[in-house]
């Protein structure tokens, strides 16, 4: 497993329990390969496991285009887990170009009753510029409604501050 973090899943689970949290999730880019480890850790620390993946989004998964961006997908229900597995598998089958990529067709096949979607980090839709990012965000929001969230993060960098200001204006 290649991680974007300096702490282990065990560290996260233990700390979440210490802080009185009720939910644990961990996401990987393009798949959910560590779900078993995290589900067992959630059980060990008496936390509810949330199935999540940081997917790669592109405008058309069938085009050989490497300008992908990140988007977070989280299951709310057991059906949502199955649906996420399906779209992640389909991204590998019909959208693989360097990475398993999904497009609007796959994303909008997800039922808002069963999944949450967020804009992810600064490597999210903001990579396409403000005008295109706003169009995509509005389309996501229309479909997912209350199951769609803008992800404001605190990283003390100029780029993160710009993204946060853009999100707050929306």
Which residues does each predicted region cover?
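Phosphodiester-processing cores and adjacent nucleic acid-binding clamps
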Residues: 1-170
């Amino acid at each position: 497993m290649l991680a974007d973090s300096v702490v282990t899943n065990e560290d996260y689970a233990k700390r979440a329990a210490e802080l009185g949290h009720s939910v644990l999730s961990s996401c990987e880019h393009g798949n959910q390969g560590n779900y078993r480890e995290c589900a067992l850790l959630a059980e060990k620390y008496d936390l509810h496991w949330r199935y999540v993946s940081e997917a790669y989004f592109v405008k058309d998964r069938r085009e050989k285009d490497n300008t992908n961006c990140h988007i977070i997908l989280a299951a709310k229900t057991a059906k949502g887990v199955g649906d996420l597995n399906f779209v992640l598998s389909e991204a590998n089958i019909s959208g693989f170009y360097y990475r398993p990529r999904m497009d609007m067709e796959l994303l909008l096949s997800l039922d808002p009753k069963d999944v949450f979607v967020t804009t992810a980090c600064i490597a999210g839709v903001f990579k396409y510029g403000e005008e295109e990012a706003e169009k995509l965000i509005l389309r996501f929001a229309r479909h997912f409604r209350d199951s769609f969230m803008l992800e404001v993060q605190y990283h003390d960098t100029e780029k993160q501050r710009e993204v946060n200001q853009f999100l707050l204006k929306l």
